[in-house]
Structure formats: C-alpha cells, structure tokens
Amino acid sequence: MFWWYYRSPARVVDPSNPWPIILWLQGGPGGSGVGFGNFAEIGPLDLNLKPRNLTWLIKADLLFVDSPVGTGFSYVDDENLLVTTDEESATDLTTLLKAIFNGNETLQKSPLFIVAESYGGKFAATLGVSALNAIEAGELKLQLGGVALGDSWISPEDFVFSWGPLLKDVSRFDNNGLSGANSLAQQIQRQIQEGKYVDATNTWGELENFVLDNSNEVDFYNFLLDSSQESTDPEVNQVPKRLLLEVYSKFISSKMFPSKGASSTPDLGTLMNGPIRQKLKIIPSNVTWDGLKGYLESSRTPLYCGQDDPITKGFFRSYKNLFFYWILGAGHFVPVDQPCVSLQMVGSITRSPNTNSTF
C-alpha cells in the first residue's frame, strides 16, 4: 500500500495535549487520497504545487493512503488479493497502521483521527472497529483519537430517498421529478433489502441520470451549481474526473459493487457505544447510541471564520462523544469550498494544540 506522511512544522511536544495525526481516507471507492485529498483539498501544496494557505497540516500531521489496493500507487502482484469488501479493506489498513506505528514510539504518543470523505466514510467506520479490536488485543500500538465522517456514503437508502425532496425544496425538481426520483429510490431500497447490491448500484446510476435530465444537470458535488459551473477552485472542477473516474482500477467497477450498496450503520453503532472517545460527524437515526436523546435536545452553536467575520459559516452541536457539523455554502468538497471554517472544525475535532490558522 502506498502512503504519504507529512510531519507538521507546527508540531509541539505537550504530554497534556498531544499533537494529533489525521489519517485521510478518500472516497470512490478508487479515489486517490495521496492525489486528490492531498493536492486538491487539504495537503500543504495545491494542484499547481503552490503552498496552500489553509492546509490541515497547520493543525495536525497528515497521513494519506491510496486505499483499497488497486487505487493510485497501491497494487498487488496477484489480482486474487484485491479486496472485495469493506472489511477486507479495513484489514489491509489495520495491517498498514501496525507497520507504521508499532515500531515508532514518537507516533504512538499522538492520537490518530480517521477522517474520511464520501465513500471513505464506509471504510472509516469499518477501520475504526478493526483498529479498536487490534488495539484491545495488543496487536496495534496507537491511540485512536476519533473517527470523523464527512458527507459519507454510509447508508445508501437514506441518501437516495433524500435527493428528491432536497431538489424539490431548492426548485430543481417539480412534482414529477420528485415522484420519479422517489420511485427509483424505492426500487434501490428493495434491491438492497434483497441483497442485490449490484442491481442496486445500477439503479443508483439510473437515478443519477434521472436527476441530471430533470434538474437541467445540477452539479452532483454541489447542488447550488450546474454541472457545467466551476467549483470554488477552478482546478478542482476537473479533478474528480481525472482522479475519481479515469484512474479507477478495473476491480473497482466489479469487485467492490456489492459493498457500495451495503450500509455501514452496524459499525457506527459499535463505535458510538464503544469505550473510546471518538467524534463522529454523523449518526443516522437507526444507529443505537445511549446519548441520542441528550444530543437531540442540545443547542447548536454558530461558526464564524475569524473574530472579525460576522458571516455565519455553519453550526455545530455536540454531546458526549458525538460532534456534528453543518458547513454552509459548501458542496461535497468542504475543505475546497470553505477552507477557513473547515480548518477550524478539524482543529476542534482533533483538539490540536495549535489554536492559530498559520504555522
């Protein structure tokens, strides 16, 4: 497995508030964390290899991995070793963490936060359980600080049923569009319940085409835009096509299809009710958690970007080991659309000793 580790220039040694490490997991499946997450979103250099002003390296060390194997520069000599499930991917990642952390006492002192985007959230939830089990068994020497899921594909049924009402609310759909989208979502739900994950994935593709045809091609990465419009960063508009589509290895479209339609909510339940102090960014209603009532009754806190900026950038709500963030004015790639407030968010999640927005 190919990985890239950045040690932050801002790293400080403080036993009472240890410096965090972020493991970034990209989506897809098949998106390169080393390529996309690193250069297009949060790494120290942008796509033009210019310094990124609001890199997450300000708040934590960064560890990017091309996962699962077959993605980016990660490969196998025997195609029979390519993973076919999220659990197998988590096993590979846990093995990698053992190789990186078990022999490095310095890294062992830093809490590891698994931060994921899109389909990476399914990997993150499963990896969180796998890593926790390895830690408790004495096989993995690291501190698991938390798991953060960003707009993650963890419950396909919930997401596809949300598309129609959302697009109707923002006037991208009329009643006919809403009805058609809901009909396809119901078909996906039936196929998932019957274990027909490949069929469900194909119907999901039909739903995407339906959305494009009936919304005048809304941007799937940001419903505030047309698909032809550029993202906040013009370069990023083309990156998903280059890194998330064209470089898919052949196993992505065949061997991982069953996992794409499956839910990760059992793994979330294990994490939420586990003994570790982790901070998930989303909890579906069907995940059992003994703090849910208190969380729902707590108030939201507004987020701003700097003391002198009066514009509301989002909200967050927290209770016990759950932190939930709403980021305004952002699409699927939050660090790109709202880099300032996302940097504040990740600093809070990881309890970074660096309270500044610079090195």
Over which residues does each language-model region extend?
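Terminal and linker regions of secretory-pathway proteins
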Residues: M1-F359
